[in-house]
Amino acid sequence: NTLEGFSRLRKLGIPLDESEIKEMQISAVAYLDKMIVNQKKKNPDKNLSYEDICYLYVRSSYRDIPLAGETLDLHKKMVEKLRYWVNLSTIEKAYAATALYRYGFVEDAKDILKSLRQYAVSQPAKGMYWPNNRSHYYYNNSAVQEQCALFNAFSEIEPVTSELDAMRQWLLSQKQTNDWGAVPSTLEAIYALLEGGTDWLAPDENKTSIVWGGQEMKNSPEEPFLGLTEYTLSGNEISAAA
């Protein structure tokens, strides 16, 4: 989560202390590389596990940190296995598509998105989502986290504004009726709302306006887009409706 969070902050253009952060990233990535090699030596399974796919997904954000030796050899074999994605779960397909796209397997990534579109549901009230989009390998994932993984894949590989907006609409519908769950789910949902699709926070000619007693109520300058805006009128300013 930490490495993925740093990569998202960089993508959003958030200023970071690059020297200190980069040192942390290099150490964390080196640890992941070492762990995956050790695991594969102990359990040389022919198939990729959910954790393997997550590793490739996160590692693909740090292609500027080189691989070498047995780590590089293993990595190449794992990426090649990732191209056989048909039996993966929905979230695994999302991670696989993103990783393959970053590693240059563009057509494979687009094929995965084509398959995912076939299973998507679009409704005016809910937007675009995938029913039962829960990993059968990793029960801790919430539907919100999986929706965000799908959103990120579509946003990076084939960004269609109408689809991205519909996927964000589903996220907002979950917030209206429940909540986004634990902290990771909430962070991922906020990132999705900020990262792709129509800029819903941009001021434009179609912004919402409130008119009260013939006077337009202005947004608070301190909170132009988010937060609570209060309007107070004294008794003599209020008259009975005609």
Can you annotate each of these PLM segments?
Residues 1-15:
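A conserved hydrophobic secondary-structure block that centers on an alpha-helix together
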